């Protein structure tokens, strides 16, 4: 997927933007 702007190590991903956590990085589905 396409990496989002934030990581998900300390804070959750912006699921509203269609991003999910994979390998400590948020990716767009």
Swiss-Prot record:
This protein's domain notes: The presence of a 'disulfide through disulfide knot' structurally defines this protein as a knottin.
Keyword check for Disulfide bond: yes
SUPFAM superfamilies, alphabetized: Cyclotides
Entry similarity comment: Belongs to the cyclotide family. Bracelet subfamily.
PROSITE patterns, A to Z: CYCLOTIDE, CYCLOTIDE_BRACELET
Keywords linked to the UniProt accession: Disulfide bond, Knottin, Plant defense
Disulfide bridges in this chain: 4-19, 8-21, 13-26
Organism: Melicytus ramiflorus
Domain of life of the organism encoding this protein: Eukaryota
Phylogenetic lineage: Eukaryota, Viridiplantae, Streptophyta, Embryophyta, Tracheophyta
Physiological role: Probably participates in a plant defense mechanism.
UniProt key word Disulfide bond: yes
Protein name per the record: Cyclotide mra2
Post-translational modifications reported in the UniProt record: This is a cyclic peptide. Contains 3 disulfide bonds.
BP GO terms, sorted: defense response
């Amino acid at each position: 997927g396409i990496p989002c702007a934030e990581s998900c190590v300390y804070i959750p991903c912006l699921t509203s933007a269609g991003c999910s956590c994979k390998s400590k990085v948020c990716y767009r589905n």
